[in-house]
């Protein structure tokens, strides 16, 4: 959004809700619970991902495989298939949770209207249906409420997608007005960082490296840093606090 970058579904959902509050992503007023589901959906995704990797990674073109290995450095692509039965059981266990939630006849996971919960859950069911339809049929067997929900999700469509290349994205950030962010540091935060400290923000569940910048926001739900890069100029990058590690830069 201009010269601000929002990382992870948790923050993207909150920003979308702020910019476009109607229709709400949280129609039942349960934003905290639904945002917590983002972390659950990470585990659902992991089960689907490892099933697909174990069955198909050897068939991918080498450049694409290398790219995926860089994206998921904590997964050993050569051996992930050894535990295929375990990951299939995990996927089915996650899918059972959806079936259970829908078993009272509700149309959507949070009730009468679609919400962030549906957005968080559906992609991994669709991923399995698309990549491994025969396996998906077995893994989702007997989940009739989930199957009906899938059709409702598909009936909503996917909106209008606008493609943008990386050079255009960089140019948009450079051209955006400088971001004025009020310094907002939680006095009760256990790490006791102060505003202006050079920090690294990185996912706490992978080793993909982090982003370095000047700390401007540190709250229970968010950390934001200001950084300057020749490709994009000066930007403020926002991360969720949940699932991200903040440490002093070397």
Residue ranges and their predicted role:
Residues 1-70, 78, 193, 200-203, ...:
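GST-like domain detector, emphasizing the conserved glutathione-binding G-site
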Residues 113, 124, 165-169, 204:
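Histidine- and/or cysteine-centered catalytic micro-motif in compact active-site loops
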């Amino acid at each position: 959004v201009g010269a601000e970058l929002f990382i992870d579904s948790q923050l993207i959902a909150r920003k979308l809700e702020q910019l476009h509050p109607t229709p709400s992503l949280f129609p039942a007023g349960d934003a905290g619970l639904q945002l917590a589901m983002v972390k659950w959906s990470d585990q659902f995704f992991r089960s689907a991902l490892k099933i697909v990797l174990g069955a198909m990674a050897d068939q991918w073109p080498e450049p694409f495989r290398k790219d995926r290995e860089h994206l998921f450095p904590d997964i050993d692509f050569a051996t992930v298939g050894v535990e295929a039965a375990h990951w299939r059981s995990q996927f089915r266990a996650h899918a059972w949770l959806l079936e259970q939630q829908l078993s009272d006849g509700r149309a959507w996971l949070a009730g009468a209207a679609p919400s962030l919960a549906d957005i968080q859950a559906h992609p991994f069911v669709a991923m399995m249906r698309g990549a491994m339809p025969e396996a998906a049929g077995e893994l989702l067997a007997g989940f009739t409420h989930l199957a009906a929900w899938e059709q409702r999700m598909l009936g909503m469509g996917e909106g209008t997608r606008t493609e943008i290349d990386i050079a255009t994205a960089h140019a948009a950030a450079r051209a955006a007005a400088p971001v004025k962010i009020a310094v907002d540091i939680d006095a009760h935060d256990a790490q006791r960082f102060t505003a202006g400290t050079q920090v690294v923000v990185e996912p706490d569940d992978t080793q993909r490296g982090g982003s370095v910048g000047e700390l401007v926001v540190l709250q229970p739900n968010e950390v934001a840093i200001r950084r300057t890069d020749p490709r994009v100029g000066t930007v403020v990058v926002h991360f969720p606090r949940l699932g991200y590690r903040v440490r002093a830069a070397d």
